[in-house]
Amino acid sequence: MGDPKRQRKKYETPPHPWIKERLDRERVLMDKYELKNKKELWKHETQLKNFRRRARRLLAARGKQAEIEREQLLSRLKRLGLLPEDAVLDDVLSLTVEDILERRLQTIVYKKGLARTMRQARQLIVHGHIEVNGQIIRSPSYLVLKEEEDKITYARTSPFANPQHPERMMIEKAKQGGEA
């Protein structure tokens, strides 16, 4: 029957390993979004690069098929919450890697106040305490769809589902302290 398809890397490494400006920029993003390693950042940069490459190709292309692909690309990015509903193809070129990092499950769990820190958000996700739309997701890099954003909660099977859980009470207290 043949061999299974070869697994390919989902990221591209930088062309030169020691460019100080890139290293500084990566360090800031790694600290801000509590990424585990550079590979996580490179995956999202490659994703962005591919979106932008497709947009540039489609801007130059003419024809019925190009129009269909334009609509597909725009609808995907709108569903992911990377673009507003009234966006055009030129807006894809202005996306940054931070826009993609803001859509990660880890970031959204932290911003919704389900965790005190980004690191705790990552731990809650990996340990199976967070569910999206009734489904436990264990990948912090999961890109949350716009319609799923309000369906992120503690998992029903998690001890955190109990509002009286001591850690959850500390999270609520930290949330109250941040608002005051």
UniProtKB/Swiss-Prot annotation:
Keyword set, alphabetical order: Ribonucleoprotein, Ribosomal protein, RNA-binding, rRNA-binding
Gene Ontology process terms (BP): ribosomal small subunit biogenesis; translation
Name of one Pfam family that matches: S4
Database matches in CDD domains: S4
Gene Ontology molecular function terms on file: rRNA binding; structural constituent of ribosome
SMART domains found in the cross-reference section: Ribosomal_S4 (SM01390), S4 (SM00363)
Ranges that cross the membrane: none
Coiled coil: none
InterPro entries in UniProt: Ribosomal_uS4, Ribosomal_uS4_arc, Ribosomal_uS4_CS, Ribosomal_uS4_euk/arc, Ribosomal_uS4_N, S4_RNA-bd, S4_RNA-bd_sf
Cysteines paired by S-S bonds: none
Family annotation (SUPFAM superfamilies): Alpha-L RNA-binding motif
S4 RNA-binding domain: residues covered: 103-174
Keyword rRNA-binding: yes
GO annotation, cellular component aspect: small ribosomal subunit
PANTHER family from the UniProt entry: 30S 40S RIBOSOMAL PROTEIN, 40S RIBOSOMAL PROTEIN S9
Subunit record text: Part of the 30S ribosomal subunit. Contacts protein S5. The interaction surface between S4 and S5 is involved in control of translational fidelity.
Role description: One of the primary rRNA binding proteins, it binds directly to 16S rRNA where it nucleates assembly of the body of the 30S subunit.
Family classification: Belongs to the universal ribosomal protein uS4 family.
UniProt-recorded name of the protein: Small ribosomal subunit protein uS4
Origin species: Pyrococcus horikoshii (strain ATCC 700860 / DSM 12428 / JCM 9974 / NBRC 100139 / OT-3)
